[in-house]
Regions:
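Acidic, metal-coordinating catalytic segment for phosphate/diphosphate chemistry
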Residues: 1-18, 88
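Short, well-ordered beta-strand micro-motif
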Residues: 21, 97-101, 117-120
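A cytosolic small-molecule/anion-sensing beta-strand core signal
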Residues: 23, 31
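A conserved beta-turn-beta hairpin within the catalytic core of GNAT-like acetyltransferases
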Residues: 36-41
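The catalytic Nudix box helix
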Residues: 43-76, 98
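Active-site-adjacent beta-strand/loop module that shapes the phosphate/pyrophosphate-binding cleft
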Residues: 81-106
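Nudix hydrolase/Nudix homology domain
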Residues: 106-158
Length: 158
């Protein structure tokens, strides 16, 4: 029996994963091609599949959305994303965001991402044309700080 997950107005929270990928002083972002957040820039990530580990799930989502192969380094943050509509919960995700390093692949938008790009810190940390959700900025900043604290070799940075 196949069970379809109801993403809109779910009965229970859904579990997702996200990736903060820092390379050469930039962070990788995707523009969402589907709801929620359609048309908005965010971190690569998505829904965890049944039976899948968190680490495998984040690597799979990054590969599906960006074409890149990554290795998760460590958990950055575990958070709730709740979108309400008319006094109801339209979306509720619990998301585990990981600091990841690129280990292969070729960058290209795929799956539910309609664009991908490397973004300089000044772009995501300011009021530029790139509008990011405050929670996303907080997660990126946490990942950026952790990446800076690690040896650059550990993240594959040049």
């Amino acid at each position: 029996m196949t069970h379809t997950v109801q993403r809109e107005f779910p009965e229970t929270p859904l579990f997702g994963v996200g990736a903060v990928i820092v390379e050469s002083g930039r962070v990788l972002l995707v523009r969402r091609g589907q709801q929620p957040l359609k048309g908005k820039w965010s971190l690569p990530g998505g829904m965890l599949e049944l039976g899948e580990s968190l680490l495998f799930g984040v690597a799979r989502e990054v590969r599906e959305e960006t074409g890149l192969e990554v290795e998760p380094i460590e958990l950055i943050e575990l958070l709730d994303r709740v979108h309400r509509e008319d006094n109801r919960v339209r979306y509720h995700y619990v998301i585990a965001d990981y600091l990841c390093r690129v280990v292969g692949g070729s960058l290209q938008a795929a799956s539910d991402a309609d664009a991908v790009r490397w973004v300089e810190r000044a772009e995501w940390n300011s009021h530029s044309a790139l509008i990011l959700d405050p929670i996303t900025v907080r997660v990126i900043e946490s990942g950026w700080q952790r990446a800076s604290a690690l040896n650059s070799k550990d993240l594959g940075n040049k």
